[in-house]
């Protein structure tokens, strides 16, 4: 009701999008400097940093196995050596599910779903309990490769862990972490100033260079662990579609996984 908090800072775009009645319309003037795909097109959600689905590879274990994208994960040499969390319970694993579907043909494409089947057949039933278990498991040498997300993987690279980041050649989705102004916020002026602040050049450069959050601003600074967007095959998630069909996508994955486990 806006009596306490003024802004919801952080959280998924899809959750905010499906609860439009809770938010105050506002588009910052700084939105003009945002990468086109992540601009505030709906009028009430401000994306401020991006997190991409990536593969994390243990450089001590990979040997001469080529991993450039999703297709390479079907290599029989990787069976049982692929780390992933459960798309039914992990937001990063679900993001990878929708990313691979989009990259391999589409959310409703039979060949894309066949890829999901083949991948989880190669995962061989080894599901990590959490998202952190994926990148930690790869860094610790329990797995050769993991389906993870950019932020913690970039930090591991900066920390000197024996890992590298692979942006899938078939296409990498970046999802925005978002902020909204709560409808009826008591101090509306300051709420709008905060939205302007997180989209400012100063803050965007700090996030990209000092932290491991990828900025949404065009030409913002990033650290050495993060490949420039221009060098990545970026594909755009249909966020409204995924939001509307999430339960169906999860159910279809669960059916595939359960069937594989029964064999």
Outline where the language-model segments fall.
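Short hydrophobic/aromatic-enriched beta-strand-loop microsegments
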Residues: 25-28, 163-167, 216
